[in-house]
Amino acid sequence: MKSVQFYEPKVIKCEDVPIKPPSEGEVVVKIMSALTCGTDVKTYRRGHPVLIKETPSGFGHEFSGVIDKLGKGVEGFKVGDRIVAANSAPCGKCFYCRHQEYNLCENLDLLNGAYAQYITVPARIVKKNMLILPSHLSFDKAAFCEPLANVVHGAYRTGIKEGQSVGIIGIGPIGLMFARVAKILGARVIVAGRNPIKLKAAEDFAHADEIIDLKKYPNPEKIFKEFSDEGKGLDVAIECVGLPEIWEQIFACVRKGGTVHFFGGCKSGSKVCFDTTKMHYGDIKMMSVFHHTPEYFRKALELISSGKIEVEKLITDTLPLEKVEYAMQQHIEGKAIKFLIKPWG
């Protein structure tokens, strides 16, 4: 099969590799649609200590497809089923799983290698995090389940409610999906970003109530507060960039009693500085949410299937496997939101 293999930072190759036969409980999926992702771009640029443990390695993790082969003992699926699979599944036995904190599982079974014609899905993911698609749902839309599951997890854990003012800095795919989910939950949403392609998507896809161009207004705190009820500050402020200075900036935008959600992960070892008086006496809730769980993976599929989230509007272009490196470069240059990768041309 054709597969994009990661060799080292900024060195990936589309080449022929063997299809891994399915072991007990596993399935081989013929990939019909895959998507580029910010994590993949970071991996392309500097590698990844978890996803890429040895090289060469498969690459990519957002996909949908058709079951091509079944391993021994697989139940609930058959060859020909149209499916979407997550890129992980919790063990259900470790300390965190016993506390129902499945996203923090110490033994997450991770899956990488979606930029390929076939992928072999581990047994635990087959059992816990692989879903059959509704007949009306396209492969292209279904491939968005994994990134949307992260956002739905974050939005529900944040407790976004109808009528609240929600502000988001950072409007890549995750920030845009956060804005759209917040709108579905009934919030009033203001977003801030720099990229003209993504600013347009904030209107066309997310349907944000107000959009700030940070090139024109680099310090959006005043605009965020003016957007809020009585100018007190946002009910919910969400950071989707992953820079310490933006963490500090978004903290300044929330009201007393509000919630700050730091969703964008900063570089390891980063430090931030907050006014502890404002945090303590303002009764401000500060939180972060990582990854997704089987529950939110299912919620993501439901949202996409319902048509409430028009994920296809986030696709910048459709490319073959041979153009994945080009896609990475386009992302680095800020010329795309997401690329749809079609392994079969």
Per-region residue spans from a language model:
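Glycine-rich phosphate-binding loop and adjacent beta-alpha segment
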Residues: 241-306, 342-345
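Glycine-rich beta-strand-centered segment in the early N-terminal region that forms part
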Residues: 20-34, 48-95, 132-136
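N-terminal Rossmann-fold NAD(P) dinucleotide-binding loop
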Residues: 175-176
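C-terminal hydrophobic helical "lid"/dimerization subdomain
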Residues: 3, 184, 191, 225, ...
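NAD(P)H dinucleotide-binding glycine-rich loop of Rossmann-like/cofactor-binding domains
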Residues: 91-169
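Adenosine-nucleotide cofactor-binding segment
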Residues: 168, 183-249
